[in-house]
């Protein structure tokens, strides 16, 4: 707990750096909304690839990983599709499906913003994503 306040400050700083960077690319990515009076210590920064783009989550994920940037899918899929949820899901929900959850599963990715990342690391992540986007032109 002694390190918590410092870790929290670093995570918020890294989160805000990502937020500032991705603000320039609203047409490509959906980014998190933060609500007033809610304090979150993000371990990772979620981004969702918008529909009708020239690339997929997989394309971006492979590019980042090839450039030594670790990524994760948002969650590990649509948890509502797990067999354990079969009895909890109503037939109405099965009929309508879970399009938003499926979309996030297919198009969502997490990039780091934890306290282990330095300003230099965050800048590197942004530089690599910028290069990826420029390759689309």
Regions found by a protein language model. Give the residues of each.
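PLP-dependent aminotransferase class I/II
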Residues: 1-137
